[in-house]
């Protein structure tokens, strides 16, 4: 009897044990109004003339089969240029469960609703997405952050406004009770999903160059910087590692080559975080619908060896900006909480539609594809070294550029200098050096 009891206890412990893995999804942009089978003006898609799906040689045989068999699957799982429909959302969640039905936690870096939706479909889409994710992972700590399409209208984030009230009502199951007041006031909260780890969810829309609101404390909108430093102090005192998550990362947009944050807010952010270089392990963001990395060097004059801040930018679920749906699974060290590997999963929308089922595939294993020494984790220094290797290796850069769009087509305004340039001046300096070295 004692042996049986021990076996049962071991089984229970093993079921509840951490697996040192978490999922990261971003930019779902689910639209309850999306019917991509129609593909007309009513679905608000980007015009098909800019798509390049026929350029893929591996599509040719499937195209012939589709035409010969007259398969009614075109647009079934969405289209390049269109936001996420109901079937694509369901298939993404199904594949997430297939990859890991019991992750330690899930990071969601914002933008749940489709683009350009009126208020009614916008709120309906937000609610449906939250219910779908919670229904699939009812016992998993899900950690969201606010995207520019999570507020109405777009980028309209203020202190203590109706958007925050709506999002709290939609995300109440994920916001810790002791963080409700912070979320309702500024849209940020902190949570510790596993022992030794603090995750800080920032409302980065407050800092966006596209946020036209004025604030009573313009140097610190909604007091979020002061709040951030309080959380970093508490985490450091507790001996916890910190992940910072947000929607819009501080740095340069790869398409417009412009700052994503207003410059004074980016400076303030790095001034604060540079004092906690050994506490902050990584940052996770989204927004640009591309799988990218950033490694920005901290600048603390009191230190002789400033570290690099590693940022992992999530590619998107929606194929609206001509990419394949992608999500990632991160593996982390149980003690240091350093990231030790990343596995990305994608599905080719065009092939999925032609075959009539989603063709999910492991896109890459970060450590293997980039030959990373992860003995001490994948931190800012490792990402900076990878950037330096990209400069001298076309094959490494080409892999990175291909993965940016979920293995669709490279649209490369991408350049290696973007990885560790936080400002236009830094980008220009890096580009000048690279050109002269070459």
Curated annotation (Swiss-Prot):
It is an enzyme of class 3 (hydrolase). InterPro entries: ASM_C, ASMase/PPN1_MPP, Calcineurin-like_PHP_ApaH, Metallo-depent_PP-like. Binds 2 Zn(2+) per subunit. Residues 1-17 form the signal peptide. Its cofactor is Zn(2+). Its EC number is 3.1.4.-. Keywords: Glycoprotein, Glycosidase, Hydrolase, Metal-binding, Secreted, Signal, Zinc. It is found in: Secreted. GO terms for cellular component: extracellular space; membrane. Zn(2+) 1 binds at residues 27, 29, 111, 289. Its main location: secreted. GO terms for biological process: ceramide biosynthetic process; sphingomyelin catabolic process. The keyword Repeat does not apply. Glycans are attached at residues 40, 160, 271, 338, 359. One of its GO terms (molecular function) is metal ion binding. Zn(2+) 2 binds at residues 111, 148, 247, 287. PANTHER family: SPHINGOMYELIN PHOSPHODIESTERASE, SPHINGOMYELINASE PHOSPHODIESTERASE D. Belongs to the acid sphingomyelinase family. This is Sphingomyelinase phosphodiesterase D. It comes from Dictyostelium discoideum (Social amoeba). The gene is sgmD.
